[in-house]
From Swiss-Prot:
One of its GO terms (cellular component) is endoplasmic reticulum membrane. Inhibits the activity of the calcium ATPases ATP2A2/SERCA2 and ATP2A3/SERCA3 by decreasing their apparent affinity for Ca(2+). It is found in: Endoplasmic reticulum membrane. It is a single-pass membrane protein. Homooligomer. Can also form heterooligomers with other sarcoplasmic/endoplasmic reticulum calcium ATPase (SERCA) regulators ARLN, PLN, SLN and STRIT1/DWORF. Monomer. Interacts as a monomer with ATP2A2/SERCA2; the interaction results in inhibition of ATP2A2 Ca(2+) affinity. This is Endoregulin. Its main location: endoplasmic reticulum.
């Protein structure tokens, strides 16, 4: 059991010492963050434009 834990620790340490793995992880995190921010902006501006359109239509009918 101790050997299995020891091998897993070695692999984990080797991963963090490889700059290509760190860079790849950073790119994946940035991509996911950008997609989430775009979705957030789409929701926020979609709600803002929908309320403005309903107010304009109500004003035109009067």
């Amino acid at each position: 059991m101790d050997q299995l834990v020891f091998k897993e620790t070695i692999w984990n340490d080797a991963f963090w010492q490889n700059p290509w793995d760190q860079g790849g992880l950073a790119v994946i995190i940035l991509f996911i963050t950008a997609v989430l921010l775009l979705i957030l902006f789409a929701i926020v501006f979609g709600l803002l434009t929908s309320t403005e359109n309903t107010q304009c239509e109500a004003g035109e009918e009067e």
